[in-house]
């Protein structure tokens, strides 16, 4: 039995669900509906709510929405649509006038007649600016002979003329002025602003015409706009959810709002889609200015950024009216008066002010650097000369005052007189030799005086000899009286005459006294030293000395000779010619009287000694 059961199991048959349900329902011969295959494109069209591009057949009416009239779609060509015009606004009698807005500024009457070719046009009016007759206001009027021509002209709304999309509307005689001031005032002002830059350029809003419209945004925007609009709050919900075409004849000049937005896709579709929030909540403050008279909402928002877009409707219209009366702002004309001769003072003042204004340095003058450098150099040179004179004056002042050389001869004569008085008792020969020695000494002193005077005359600017010369000691026998006591009693005389002291032999023996010469004046010459040494040698023969005097005398001679050579070497460059060889004339005249006085004094002393 089990084997038979296995044999009875067979593979089942696949049937559709509708057939299975029909068999289970017991209806027997029920009709079965098999859906036709639908492409994914058709399904998305149904979900989006858009209409397919194919016409529906009667078989599809069960599954699809009823067909929609293509002529009301905004994407349909304008030639396929009838002009959506309120016939109640059309004039019943001529003239049949159409308003033309957004005209190019280079438009002419012939170009407008060519634009409306085929129509019975009778006249064209193009208003011009009162301040500038060559400039158009941007709008005009066209009169037609019959009503059919006017209807045909209204169907040409938003057509291009000279790279501009012009507006064609019915011109009501009672509303011409108000329409000019309020409805198209913004367009004229906007176009006049564009003339300042590139008014021939294509409007920037044309690029938004290619965007497809969206369904649902229109009712949403109308609902909130009407809700916040205080003037039309009563009709808010009714107008916001109205499905059919909406006409506000009294307020918007008979223009169909849906037609206006439908013909301009950017206003209804693109702009409301991207800015619905601003449109819903901000339109209450804008007082419905965006849609008045077919105004371009997008251009009004972005082309005209001024405070009037937020003002009330009445204020805005009055402002436009005043601005139209005034005309565009222009530069005031120059009122040139006849030229009059300006005053000299005013002219000089103006020239001075203009010169100061033109000079970036003001009243400053350029500095003559060469002259300034010369002045500085002269001032520095004067200062150096003054400083040099100040340095030279102290040197001249420091020069010791030269005393007349007669004081040396007198002092020497007194000393010799005392010495000869003491020596005359010894021998007459010694007195004679002393007298000759004194005569030679006086002659040499006069000669030294003459030489000193001539040297001063020939070399007034010669440097004085250095004061720090080595001290010299002169060998001399002890005098009659103590030389140290005499020096202490009369230091100036001794200091000045120490270099002319002569050795005098005394009975005390041969002692040598070291005599320190004082500071020598500038007139002191080396010839005096040699003469003194010669005089000492002359007296050495007649004076009795000790056994050691000869050696010490030779030693001091050598020292004096070396010192004289050093002084000669330390002298400055060879001075001008010095008449050392021929002072005979001056010496004879000066020494003649000196010799007589010395001889007379010697004779008197000799007489005293003999007595």
Curated annotation (Swiss-Prot):
A Pfam match: RRM_1
Biased composition (Basic and acidic residues): 79-89, 173-203, 211-271, 285-328, 370-420, 439-458, 551-583
Cross-referenced InterPro entries: EIF-4B_RRM, Nucleotide-bd_a/b_plait_sf, RBD_domain_sf, RRM_dom
UniProt modified residues of type N6-acetyllysine: 365, 586
GO cellular component: cytosol; dendrite; neuronal cell body; postsynapse
Compositionally biased region (Polar residues): 487-506
Protein biosynthesis in keyword set: yes
Record GO terms (molecular function): RNA binding; translation initiation factor activity
Residue ranges, compositional bias (Low complexity): 348-359, 584-597
Complex formation: Self-associates and interacts with EIF3 p170 subunit.
UniProt name for this protein: Eukaryotic translation initiation factor 4B
Species for this entry: Mus musculus (Mouse)
């Amino acid at each position: 039995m089990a084997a038979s059961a296995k044999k009875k199991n067979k593979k089942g048959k696949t049937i559709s669900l509708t057939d299975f349900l029909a068999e289970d329902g017991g209806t027997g011969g029920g009709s079965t509906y098999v859906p036709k295959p639908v492409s994914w494109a058709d399904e998305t069209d149904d979900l989006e709510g858009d209409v397919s591009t194919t016409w529906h057949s009667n078989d599809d009416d069960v599954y699809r929405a009823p067909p929609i009239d293509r002529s009301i779609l905004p994407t349909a060509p304008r030639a396929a649509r009838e002009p959506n015009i309120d016939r109640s606004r059309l004039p019943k009698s001529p003239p049949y006038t159409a308003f033309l807005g957004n005209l190019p500024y280079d438009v002419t009457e012939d170009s407008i007649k060519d634009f409306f070719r085929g129509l019975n046009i009778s006249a064209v009016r193009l208003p011009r600016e009162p301040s500038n007759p060559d400039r158009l206001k941007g709008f005009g009027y066209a009169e037609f002979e019959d009503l059919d021509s006017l209807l045909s002209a209204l169907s040409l709304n938003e057509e291009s003329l000279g790279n501009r999309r012009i507006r064609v509307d019915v011109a009501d005689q009672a509303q011409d002025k108000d329409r000019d001031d309020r409805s198209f005032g913004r367009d004229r002002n906007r176009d006049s602003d564009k003339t300042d830059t590139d008014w021939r350029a294509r409007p920037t809003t044309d690029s938004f015409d290619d965007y497809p419209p969206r369904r649902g945004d229109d009712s949403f925007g109308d609902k909130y706009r009407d809700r916040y609009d205080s003037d039309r709050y009563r009709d808010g919900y009714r107008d916001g959810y109205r499905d059919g075409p909406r006409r506000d004849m009294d307020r918007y000049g008979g223009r169909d709002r849906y037609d206006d937005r439908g013909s301009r896709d950017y206003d209804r579709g693109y702009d409301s889609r991207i800015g619905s929030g601003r449109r819903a909540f901000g339109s209450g403050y804008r007082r419905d200015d965006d849609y008045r008279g077919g105004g371009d909402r997008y251009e009004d928002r972005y082309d005209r950024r001024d405070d009037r877009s937020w003002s009330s409707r009445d204020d805005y219209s009055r402002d436009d009216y005043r601005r139209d009366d005034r005309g565009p702002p222009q530069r005031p004309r120059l009122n040139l008066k006849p030229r009059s001769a300006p005053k000299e003072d005013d002219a000089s003042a103006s020239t001075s002010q203009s010169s100061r204004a033109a000079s970036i340095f003001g009243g400053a003058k350029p500095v003559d650097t060469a002259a300034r450098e010369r002045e500085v150099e002269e001032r520095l040179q004067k200062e150096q000369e003054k400083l040099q004179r100040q340095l030279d004056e102290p040197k001249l002042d420091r020069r010791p005052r030269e005393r007349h050389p007669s004081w040396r001869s007198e002092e020497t004569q007194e000393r010799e007189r005392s010495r000869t008085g003491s020596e005359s008792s010894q021998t007459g020969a010694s007195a004679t030799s002393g007298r000759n020695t004194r005569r030679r000494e006086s002659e040499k002193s006069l000669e030294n005086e003459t030489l000193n005077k001539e040297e001063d005359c020939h070399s007034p600017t010669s440097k004085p000899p250095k004061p720090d010369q080595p001290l010299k000691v002169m060998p001399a026998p002890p005098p009659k009286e103590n030389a140290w006591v005499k020096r202490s009693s009369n230091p100036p005389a001794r200091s000045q005459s120490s270099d002319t002291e002569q050795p005098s032999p005394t009975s005390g023996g041969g002692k040598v006294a070291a005599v320190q010469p004082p500071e020598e004046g500038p007139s002191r010459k080396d010839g005096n030293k040699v003469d003194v040494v010669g005089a000492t040698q002359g007296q050495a023969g007649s004076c009795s000395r000790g056994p050691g005097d000869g050696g010490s005398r030779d030693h001091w001679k050598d020292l004096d000779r070396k010192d004289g050579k050093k002084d000669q070497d330390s002298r400055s460059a060879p001075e001008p010619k010095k008449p050392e060889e021929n002072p005979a004339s001056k010496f004879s005249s000066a020494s003649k009287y000196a010799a007589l006085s010395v001889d007379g004094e010697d004779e008197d002393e000799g007489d005293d000694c003999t007595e």
